[in-house]
Amino acid sequence: MTTVLGIETSCDETAVAIVNNRRICSSVVASQIDLHKRYGGVVPEEASRQHLLTINPCIEQALQTAKLTWNDIDGIAATVAPGLIGALMVGETAAKTLAMIHHKPFLGIHHLEGHIYATYLSEPDWKPPFLCLLVSGGHTSLIHVKDCGVYEQLGTTRDDAAGEAFDKVARLLNLGYPGGPIIDQLATQGNPKRFNLPEGKVSLPQGGYHPYDSSFSGLKTAVLRLVEKLKQEKTEPLPIADLAASFQETVARSLTKKTITCALDHHISHIAVGGGVAANSGLRNHLQEAAKKRNLTVHFPPLKLCTDNAAMIACAACDHLKKGHISSWNLGVQSRLPITEVMTLY
């Protein structure tokens, strides 16, 4: 049995958790949403300062909630890539310091691998190989999960990530931050078929379109032009709910098509979804319905495990530690690192 304390500070949540194999002993998340809401997005310097203020109380709370001492901890992990450099450094420095003081191995964890491992926390018997649709504010990827640390990226976004597109459209409609949950809520009150918006397609040099890659910048521009047109017409109040529903419908439909096509082309029968956009009701409904028609299994983590948390980081670290993967004390943080290069962290 392996018990790991994990730390996640890659963006705007300070999170600490203790996981025993695939069982959560404690999970603490201090969100900074209210702090960044006034700016309409995450301010890196503010995020780093807030992490510094909250990291130690979060660590203490995680230990107290789990009713464990440092003697019960087998390893200490932190997200080291990708993310905001200053924010990552807070978690990495805290983890390394604790590991040195308490003579524990240190493990640097890839943030996207953490989102993949969120599936294991709610489905402990889930095993590779499977396809993971990872959709968040910074990433939109289709990843073939072959084993711990062994990943093949089959699809990605060529511009905006799905979550980023939600935030930008929400800002365009003056809905506030973060945009994803607000648009999702409004979409339930709107008509998703009122506006015909374009699905982003990525052209190939030899002709045709990439079957798995996404593009959301064109969709975002289409919403902008539609809003400008509706404002000029002034025939009625701006139909915010219908716009939100039509936008969400287009994103969910596009991601579902690419995910199902990718799974079938690669003969993968199990699909997991991770990242903040995995909480979106439109995506959940579309993907579950499409998977059922094709006799594919699809799993969405509980909502609390879709957004950034440290339990997923600790869970990934448990598997790496059991395989003897330990990071060097000289390991630094990186703003970018492909998921295929996870093993360079050990």
From Swiss-Prot:
PROSITE patterns in the cross-refs: GLYCOPROTEASE (PS01016)
Keywords: Acyltransferase, Cytoplasm, Iron, Metal-binding, Transferase, tRNA processing
GO CC terms: cytoplasm
Superkingdom classification of source: Bacteria
Cofactor notes: Binds 1 Fe(2+) ion per subunit.
Pfam families the UniProt entry points to: TsaD
Disulfide bonds: none
Main enzyme class: transferase
Chief location category: cytoplasm
UniProt catalytic activity: L-threonylcarbamoyladenylate + adenosine(37) in tRNA = N(6)-L-threonylcarbamoyladenosine(37) in tRNA + AMP + H(+)
Record localization: Cytoplasm
Annotated positions binding substrate: 134-138, 167, 180, 184, 280
EC number: 2.3.1.234
Cofactor: Fe(2+)
Binding site for Fe cation: 111, 115, 308
GO molecular function: iron ion binding; N(6)-L-threonylcarbamoyladenine synthase activity
GO BP terms: tRNA threonylcarbamoyladenosine modification
PANTHER family, sorted: TRNA N6-ADENOSINE THREONYLCARBAMOYLTRANSFERASE, TRNA N6-ADENOSINE THREONYLCARBAMOYLTRANSFERASE, MITOCHONDRIAL
HAMAP family from the UniProt entry: TsaD
Protein function: Required for the formation of a threonylcarbamoyl group on adenosine at position 37 (t(6)A37) in tRNAs that read codons beginning with adenine. Is involved in the transfer of the threonylcarbamoyl moiety of threonylcarbamoyl-AMP (TC-AMP) to the N6 group of A37, together with TsaE and TsaB. TsaD likely plays a direct catalytic role in this reaction.
Annotated NCBIfam families: gcp_kae1, T6A_TsaD_YgjD
Similarity section: Belongs to the KAE1 / TsaD family.
UniProt name for this protein: tRNA N6-adenosine threonylcarbamoyltransferase
Gene name in the database record: tsaD
